[in-house]
Amino acid sequence: QDLPGNDNSTATLCLGHHAVPNGTLVKTITDDQIEVTNATELVQSSSTGKICNNPHRILDGRDCTLIDALLGDPHCDVFQDETWDLFVERSNAFSNCYPYDVPDYASLRSLVASSGTLEFITEGFTWTGVTQNGGSNACKRGPASGFFSRLNWLTKSGSTYPVLNVTMPNNDNFDKLYIWGVHHPSTNQEQTNLYVQASGGVTVSTRRSQQTIIPNIGSRPWVRGQSGRISIYWTVVKPGDVLVINSNGNLIAPRGYFKMRTGKSSIMRSDAPIDTCISECITPNGSIPNDKPFQNVNKITYGACPKYVKQNTLKLATGMRNVPEKQTRGLFGAIAGFIENGWEGMIDGWYGFRHQNSEGTGQAADLKSTQAAIDQINGKLNRVIEKTNEKFHQIEKEFSEVEGRIQDLEKYVEDTKIDLWSYNADVLVALENQHTIDLTDSEMNKLFEKTRRQLRENAEDMGNGCFKIYHKCDNACIESIRNGTYDHDIYRDEALNNRFQIKGVELKSGYKDWILWISFAISCFLLCVVLLGFIMWACQRGNIRCNICI
């Protein structure tokens, strides 16, 4: 007798999801490595090797440092009144004027860099009884001796150097930055030759601050033919405040002020070339795209940049769990459900159906469940980027040798922040990956349950993601199941009749085996009963005695 399941009276419908031959390994909360059909790299690990000049205004310092440009070193005159978003200092920058030091170099550099301008306003300071515009052979401006263009070196006039007392109010509505200095001669003779007094002094004050500097006379290592030094200082005068300068010698006076601006301009040391291109994020290595949430190119950044992490790679799952398709399927060929494996041949959707009926075999994607999964996954990358991208810049920190402990503490804090963000990135990506896999599995289960509810008693769950349909189901019938218009009442009587026939035949085909097992069990039971009866009878007759000792 032929089985009803082998003729045209039944059909097989399987549900499955797509798969690829070689997936991508990602990390989730529960698994360090799980294969998915598709994933996106989240860590930017390389730069363009060049700094883009758009949309940020880049000012190439070339052979000048920012402080040299600020002071007006002769070879930096081209930077007068310049503006920038990012000032790029080069490793080959050098000073070419009178040797100087800035006791609070890092703070001054940072202050000017963030202001984003070298706009300078000359003011009418009155220096009575002294000679102005001093110069040095160490600071050539053309063939003649020169000096920093933003500073005024005051020396004796004749044989006198009177006490200077000058005030300059700030009647404007913005902060003013004044740069001034103190000259440290190399010998006592140089001191008296320039300033008459054996020891001079400078005091600069406002209502909020006061600085008093006494020259330190003594020989230092020769630089550009000079063993003396100039110490550069700075004072910020707020609106409504007054700048007061008192000196009896050694004063390097300001010629005016720099107009301070508030903004997010910055400075960066880099030897990367500047090119015409567009990039929001800049590192010392060059510009990098900011379409990823993380980067490990450089800790120092400017602009809207990915967050720096230690990891070289973090992959965000943008596809479902990948279960490559098995190559052999026995009698049913490739028709098997999602419980066993995915389907590599399905390219027009993530979820779908395969069927086998009287008209042959076929496959179709389920676009509704596919779109539901894609809608939930789309935007994941953008959401991660929004959570992590810096909207500000991270500048390099500089400290003098005296502030070594502060530098160590700052480094520790920065390293701790990087460790924390690296850990957070790991957890964030693992959580997102877990969510992606769970939701794609959920969509598969939803589709399977939806199909089960349609078929009801007309089909049987085969346990592998497939249904055995107990009625004739042509391609139109299969299509009605896929699109949700299937009416199980129409096929119920036929399905019940075929189910009973198939189950009955299956019972008859296994009848002999059941009889053998039942007969064996009864025989064993009867043998045990006879043996137990014989022992009891023998004990009563005295033929067998049983002693129990305690």
Curated annotation (Swiss-Prot):
The record marks R329, G330 as: Cleavage. It is a single-pass type I membrane protein. It is found in: Virion membrane; Host apical cell membrane. Keywords: Clathrin- and caveolin-independent endocytosis of virus by host, Clathrin-mediated endocytosis of virus by host, Disulfide bond, Fusion of virus membrane with host endosomal membrane, Fusion of virus membrane with host membrane, Glycoprotein, Hemagglutinin, Host cell membrane, Host membrane, Host-virus interaction, Lipoprotein, Membrane, Palmitate, Transmembrane, Transmembrane helix, Viral attachment to host cell, Viral envelope protein, Viral penetration into host cytoplasm, Virion, Virus endocytosis by host, Virus entry into host cell. The chain crosses the membrane at residues 515-535. Its main location: virion. One of its GO terms (molecular function) is host cell surface receptor binding. Disulfide bonds join C14-C466, C52-C277, C64-C76, C97-C139, C281-C305, C473-C477. GO terms for biological process: clathrin-dependent endocytosis of virus by host cell; fusion of virus membrane with host endosome membrane; fusion of virus membrane with host plasma membrane; virion attachment to host cell. The keyword Repressor does not apply. Residues 1-514 are extracellular. It comes from the Viruses. Palmitoylated. GO terms for cellular component: host cell plasma membrane; membrane; viral envelope; virion membrane. Belongs to the influenza viruses hemagglutinin family. Homotrimer of disulfide-linked HA1-HA2. Binds to sialic acid-containing receptors on the cell surface, bringing about the attachment of the virus particle to the cell. This attachment induces virion internalization either through clathrin-dependent endocytosis or through clathrin- and caveolin-independent pathway. Plays a major role in the determination of host range restriction and virulence. Class I viral fusion protein. Responsible for penetration of the virus into the cell cytoplasm by mediating the fusion of the membrane of the endocytosed virus particle with the endosomal membrane. HAMAP family: INFV_HEMA. Major glycoprotein, comprises over 80% of the envelope proteins present in virus particle. This is Hemagglutinin.
